């Protein structure tokens, strides 16, 4: 589930991927999408052809990376929520694996359902700056680009080309574009999917039991 700090469940997590975060070196994937085994088919949630697990457990011995996996997920949410506050020249707090080479990238990507629509968002940090970022959503099951980012260059989807000018004015190398655009659209009560996803992704919070 995707949890809101005050109002409870707001959506369903589908997948989270990360790499080069603390003890996590190579990319790992946590997925709530069911495999081909249909033994417990009645326990699954079905949506637009996806077979989704209702519950999952992360387990393993001490030192296997469970805590750092949760830390990576919470870091992803923290960046969406807080990076707008970073000042020009301030470095992004990248937490590389101890064996990573200088300048090696760290990546984070999340997918979840909200109001029946699937969203996919991710970003890459390199040399303590935002190197790449993207946001898609899937109305009627088909992928639609909201924006893609490479360095300081933003490529909006067709229906968003006239919407992002004010967001670009506050974009910095250490700020996520989602944070810039989401904050502005949230204040205006506009922005459609960008505003909705910003509000939801900023509330991603997980904890160990």
Cite the ranges covered by each PLM segment.
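Pre-Walker A-like glycine/lysine-rich segment at the N-terminus of P-loop NTPase domains
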Residues: 2-75
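Structural beta-strand/beta-sheet cores of well-ordered domains, especially the beta-sheet scaffolds
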Residues: 14, 106-108, 174
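Short acidic, glycine-rich loop/turn motifs
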Residues: 18, 22, 112-114, 137
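Short beta-strand segments
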Residues: 26-30, 117-121, 145
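Conserved P-loop NTP-binding catalytic core
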Residues: 45-51, 57, 61, 70-121, ...
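Electropositive, glycine-dotted interaction segments
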Residues: 120-209
